[in-house]
Amino acid sequence: MKGVYFVSGIDTDIGKTVATGMLAKQLLQQGKSVITQKPVQTGCQDIAEDIAVHRKIMGIPMQEADKRRLTMPEIFSYPASPHLAARLDGRALDLDKIRTATQELAAQYEIVLVEGAGGLMVPLTEKLLTIDYIQQQAYPVILVTSGRLGSINHTLLSFAALKQYGIRLHSLVFNHIHDSRDAHIAQYSLSYLKCRLKADFSEAEWMELAKTDAV
């Protein structure tokens, strides 16, 4: 791996933050120079909570890039989608600020993992969806899914969107932490999605996040 990767999910609260932190930790253990970024954090006042979770999982303190807000360029107080949180805070989301911060991180680190807010179709602004931004920046996507009920549908919809927009899927991360309590559903979801990934995105990697990785 090298460059900037966008971590998205099939839904809200699917485990993107833990997945991002665990992947960054694994890369650190491999001797890679890696940093995570949360370009838009909502529901916070000062520090991006997701970045704090990343650092805890990675086993490192807050970095200089964190102190300079390069890893958390836009923070809004209301816990909502970025476009609504920005409106309620009475200011516009600054896409140029986000792009510049990511570029600066990419110049300093071998790998940058950018954790998005929610799923691919979450609005960043009134006119721009998250998937539009990913396409504009030509970022490969790391998609987080799970074995809970509904995940097959949401994952296949995400696959279809990535294909429609011509975006490369780097990997699908199956998050066991958010599995269904029904073991049959969880296991079938895993086997089905593993087969669909091979059929739809043959070059993409399959990864799994174990329950023991929960923070």
Swiss-Prot record:
ATP binds at D13, I14, G15, K16, T17, V18, D50, E115, G116, A117, G118, N175, H176. One of its GO terms (cellular component) is cytosol. Its EC number is 6.3.3.3. Substrate binds at T42. SUPFAM superfamilies: P-loop containing nucleoside triphosphate hydrolases. Homodimer. It catalyses: (7R,8S)-7,8-diammoniononanoate + CO2 + ATP = (4R,5S)-dethiobiotin + ADP + phosphate + 3 H(+). Catalyzes a mechanistically unusual reaction, the ATP-dependent insertion of CO2 between the N7 and N8 nitrogen atoms of 7,8-diaminopelargonic acid (DAPA, also called 7,8-diammoniononanoate) to form a ureido ring. HAMAP family: BioD. The active site is at K38. Belongs to the dethiobiotin synthetase family. NCBIfam families: bioD. InterPro entries: DTB_synth_BioD, P-loop_NTPase. It comes from the Bacteria. Mg(2+) binds at T17, D50, E115. The gene is bioD. Keywords: ATP-binding, Biotin biosynthesis, Cytoplasm, Ligase, Magnesium, Metal-binding, Nucleotide-binding. Its cofactor is Mg(2+). GO terms for molecular function: ATP binding; dethiobiotin synthase activity; magnesium ion binding. Pathway: Cofactor biosynthesis; biotin biosynthesis; biotin from 7,8-diaminononanoate: step 1/2. Transmembrane segments: none annotated. This is ATP-dependent dethiobiotin synthetase BioD. It is found in: Cytoplasm. The keyword Nucleotide-binding applies. GO terms for biological process: biotin biosynthetic process.
